[in-house]
Amino acid sequence: MDGIRVLPLSCDDYYWPKWTPDSLYGYDTPAGIDAAALLAELEQLCRKNANSLRRYDMVSHRVWREPFQQDYDLIVLEGAFGPQALLGQPLLRSMVYLELALPLRLWRRQRRDRRERGHSLVYVIRQTVLETLPGERDFIRPLRQKADLVIQNSPSGLATLTQHARSLVAP
């Protein structure tokens, strides 16, 4: 991010292992995230005291630690179902809400889920309509009002995001 050393951290790596998906939302709910593990990891990273990062495999539901050694100025927590547990925590210095059009999200999701998870196109569409969209409505959209910055996926949005990131790491 233009001179800022960013450590990306994915909320998807904090799903509970062997968790039974919610009957209404499937995996598209904050209840699927081990918030205590996520918070503990963030605390270690903020103290620059971490030597491994948690990883989660969406197909096998296996959790493991991966060695980690990277200099960073900013931790970017990416994901839809981790921020809810961090609201009000001092570790969450800023929240950015990225808006993407539904067709683009569906296109990206079906590509990822078919390639990485072996799901069929019909399965991805069904999951999106029956689980993802209700989860988005109930858990993700409310974050928009709590965000410090709302951006569109556009060149001007990226410039605004970069400027915001610089303000967070400025001495």
Please tell me what each predicted stretch does.
Residues 7-8, 16-64, 69, 74:
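Conserved nucleotide-sensing/catalytic segment adjacent to the nucleotide-binding pocket
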